[in-house]
Each structure stands twice: as structure tokens, then as C-alpha cells.
């Protein structure tokens, strides 16, 4: 492992979050300007990340061993769940504001705590359960304007709330699969085979109706894949230089970026309930990270292999 350099790890983490957030903004733009469906977005996001990942492995001299796997079906399960989560998150971007989708996405690490107890038999005690409760309360606050039952409620925003929450649950379940895979598999293999699987699954949605993109939309779609691959490399590198418990909280920089991009690019001013709810979710997430550090639970390899979307 490289010499520990916490500042470099933090900077790499912030860079990865920034690139992932810009990538998500590009995806949202293709939804708003060209009505590109989520399956098509997943295909381009995944396909054009693969060359970036392969070049990175080749430069590190790991192309031969980096893709080797002893758990092919594990990658399939993780790929299917992660692809569904990514598609739901991309769909949510078409239905809700950028800050709303970002805030709801923070439910994923909270749900991981619950899923780890359910599926991995992990011992989860009062403190972390309390933080999960606080965080999910924050998520409900963010969701509350969309879940009103009045006659004037916007059905598309209601659908967006459900879709975004489904994406967060899918991302959490994908993290459970990754947590099992990292016990035997290299991070590079997990990242590559997820991109490969999601490319195939994204392509399978072609019969359900894709759009023919104009030049600008095509550049945004291709760019989202390239940026997605670059962000994954930055994320993986961040955890090589600093402990997960130090680096992971900087995930929440994405909220500031989402607010700025939503405001300046999409004309979306964050509602007060979003800011209040997001604050509770972020507080709970940071406290869970702190508690896992106290308990000596190592999450670096799992976090290296995950993306913000699934």
C-alpha cells in the first residue's frame, strides 16, 4: 500500500465526488433536453467507462490480473442490482431536482446498516440504529412535499420520490454484494465487471425505445461514461492514500455541488425542507462512519468499488 497521505486522499475523494456530480448533471441534461431514457443513459455511462478503466489498469501493469475473477456469479448479481439502482437514479434525475435526488441518495449508506444486519448477520446496536432512524427521518422530510395526497399533488414528482428511494435501496443492496465480493476479488475486477454487466443490461433496453441523439446529446452521453470511469479511478485512488473513515465523509461535498449546479445550470433553487432533511441525513451518515471507525470495521475496499449511482 502507498505511503499514507491523508491530504492527497481527501483531495482525490473530493475530485471523484466533483466528477461524479458533473457526470450526473450531464445525465440529467440529456433527460431534460432530449428525453433520453434511463436504459440508454446506463448503456452510454457504462460502455464509455470501460476504455478508461482498461487504460488505467494497463498503465498500472495490472491488465492481466486485474480482471481475473473467481466469483463470476457474484459479479452478475452485483451487476444486475447495481444496474437497476443506476437506472432508477438516472430516472429520478428526470423527475426531481438535482439537490432532491442527491439528498435522497444519501439514504443508501443508512440502508446498508439495516441490510448488513439482515443479510450478513452483522451486529448492529443502538447507536447505529439510532443514527439510521435520524437519517431516515431526514429522508422523509426531503420526500414530504412529493408524497402529499392532495388533489393538486404532482404525480410525476410523487413517482420521482418513489423512484429515487428505490434507487437508494438498490444502491444499498449493491453495497452488500460488494462487501461480499471484496473478500475474494480485486477492486479492479469488481469495477470492470460491473461496467461490463451494466453495458449489456443497458443495451437490452434498446427494444423498449431509445432516442436518436443529436450531436450535443451524444457528446453528453459519451462524456458521462468517460467521466464516470475517471471518477471511479479517482475514488479508488483516494482510499489507497487515506483511511476510509477519514475520506468517506467528504462524499457529502456532493450536496454543495448539487445545489450549485441545480441553481446555475437547471434553475432549481433548493427548498428549505430539502436543506433541513439533507442536514439530518448527512449528520447521521457521518456519525455512522465515525462509529464504524470506533468499532474497527474496515470499509475501504467496499467503498473503492462503489459509485454514487449504484
PLM region spans:
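C-terminal transmembrane-helix exit sites in multi-pass transporters
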Residues: 89-91, 108-133, 256-275
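Loop-to-transmembrane-helix transition segments
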Residues: 9-16, 63-88, 158-167, 212-230
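Helix-helix packing/entry segments at the starts of transmembrane helices
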Residues: 44, 102-107, 181-197, 232-264
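Cytoplasmic-side transmembrane-helix entry/capping segments in multi-pass membrane proteins
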Residues: 9-15, 69-79, 124-137, 157-160, ...
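Hydrophobic/small/kink-forming positions within alpha-helical transmembrane segments
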Residues: 17-25, 54, 79-87, 109-114, ...
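Transmembrane alpha-helices of multi-pass small-molecule transport proteins
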Residues: 34-84, 169-174, 193-208
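Juxtamembrane helix-loop boundary signature in multi-pass membrane transporters
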Residues: 1-14, 113-165, 169, 282-310
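Transmembrane alpha-helical segments that form core, pore/gating elements
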Residues: 21, 25, 53, 149-210, ...
Amino acid at each position: 500500500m502507498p505511503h499514507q497521505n491523508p491530504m492527497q486522499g481527501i483531495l482525490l475523494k473530493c475530485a471523484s465526488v466533483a466528477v461524479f456530480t458533473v457526470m450526473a448533471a450531464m445525465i440529467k441534461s440529456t433527460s431534460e433536453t432530449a428525453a433520453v431514457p434511463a436504459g440508454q443513459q446506463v448503456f452510454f455511462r457504462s460502455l464509455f467507462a470501460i476504455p478508461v478503466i482498461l487504460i488505467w489498469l494497463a498503465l498500472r501493469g495490472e491488465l492481466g490480473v486485474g480482471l481475473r475473477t473467481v466469483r463470476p456469479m457474484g459479479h452478475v448479481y452485483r451487476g444486475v442490482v447495481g444496474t437497476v439502482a443506476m437506472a432508477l437514479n438516472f430516472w429520478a434525475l428526470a423527475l426531481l431536482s438535482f439537490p432532491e435526488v442527491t439528498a435522497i441518495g444519501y439514504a443508501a449508506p443508512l440502508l446498508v446498516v439495516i441490510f448488513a444486519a439482515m443479510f450478513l448477520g452483522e451486529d448492529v446496536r443502538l447507536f447505529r440504529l439510532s443514527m439510521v432512524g435520524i437519517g431516515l427521518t431526514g429522508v422523509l422530510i426531503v420526500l414530504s412535499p412529493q408524497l402529499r395526497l392532495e388533489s393538486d399533488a404532482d404525480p410525476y414528482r410523487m413517482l420521482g420520490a418513489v423512484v429515487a428511494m428505490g434507487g437508494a435501496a438498490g444502491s444499498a443492496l449493491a453495497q452488500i454484494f460488494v462487501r461480499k465480493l471484496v473478500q475474494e476479488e480485486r477492486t479492479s475486477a469488481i469495477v470492470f465487471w460491473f461496467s461490463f454487466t451494466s453495458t449489456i443490461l443497458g443495451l437490452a433496453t434498446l427494444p423498449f425505445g431509445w432516442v436518436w441523439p443529436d450531436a450535443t446529446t451524444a457528446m453528453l452521453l459519451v462524456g458521462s461514461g468517460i467521466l464516470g470511469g475517471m471518477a471511479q479511478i479517482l475514488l479508488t485512488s483516494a482510499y489507497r492514500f487515506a483511511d476510509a473513515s477519514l475520506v468517506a465523509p467528504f462524499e457529502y461535498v456532493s450536496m454543495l455541488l448539487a445545489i450549485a449546479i441545480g441553481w446555475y445550470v437547471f434553475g432549481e433553487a433548493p427548498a428549505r425542507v430539502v436543506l433541513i432533511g439533507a442536514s439530518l441525513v448527512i449528520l447521521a451518515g457521518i456519525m455512522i462512519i465515525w462509529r464504524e471507525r470506533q468499532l474497527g470495521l474496515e470499509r475501504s475496499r467496499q467503498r473503492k468499488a462503489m459509485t454514487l449511482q449504484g
